[in-house]
Amino acid sequence: MQRTLSIIKPDAVKKNVVGKIIDRFESNGLRIAAAKKVKLSKCDAKAFYAVHSERPFFNDLVEFMTSGPVVVMVLEGENAVAKNRELMGATNPKEAAAGTIRADFAESIDANAVHGSDSLENAINEINFFFAAREIC
């Protein structure tokens, strides 16, 4: 059993599609082991996305991720990292396959509805960023 981190981003929270996105995960074999709604501070967003700090989009990403609440979740299941990424679809919703979360709920490459860990190693680090072990069950 594998775990991964998912973030439902401010655009999707604002559009009130959190339940629809969670349903996609659950109906495709991923179980929610932990979840909470949080408002990221700029400091939190910069730390979480530090890997992108030298990229030209970094400041816009931080601004976007702090523009409203997000829902962070630990998803659990067989090949959870790959399954979550498959369900999310391509980063750019215009390139995302029909029926994926981003194709159905995202507006743009920036406001793309969801974040998901891109590797098992990053999943562990990202989960630990948001959750204490006692919060995951």
Swiss-Prot record:
The active site is at 115 (pros-phosphohistidine intermediate). InterPro entries: NDK-like_dom, NDK-like_dom_sf, Nucleoside_diP_kinase, Nucleoside_diP_kinase_AS. The keyword Phosphoprotein applies. GO terms for molecular function: ATP binding; metal ion binding; nucleoside diphosphate kinase activity. It catalyses: a 2'-deoxyribonucleoside 5'-diphosphate + ATP = a 2'-deoxyribonucleoside 5'-triphosphate + ADP; a ribonucleoside 5'-diphosphate + ATP = a ribonucleoside 5'-triphosphate + ADP. Its cofactor is Mg(2+). One of its GO terms (cellular component) is cytoplasm. Keywords: ATP-binding, Cytoplasm, Kinase, Magnesium, Metal-binding, Nucleotide metabolism, Nucleotide-binding, Phosphoprotein, Transferase. It is an enzyme of class 2 (transferase). PANTHER family: NUCLEOSIDE DIPHOSPHATE KINASE, NUCLEOSIDE DIPHOSPHATE KINASE DDB_G0292928-RELATED. Major role in the synthesis of nucleoside triphosphates other than ATP. The ATP gamma phosphate is transferred to the NDP beta phosphate via a ping-pong mechanism, using a phosphorylated active-site intermediate. This is Nucleoside diphosphate kinase. It comes from Campylobacter curvus (strain 525.92). The gene is ndk.
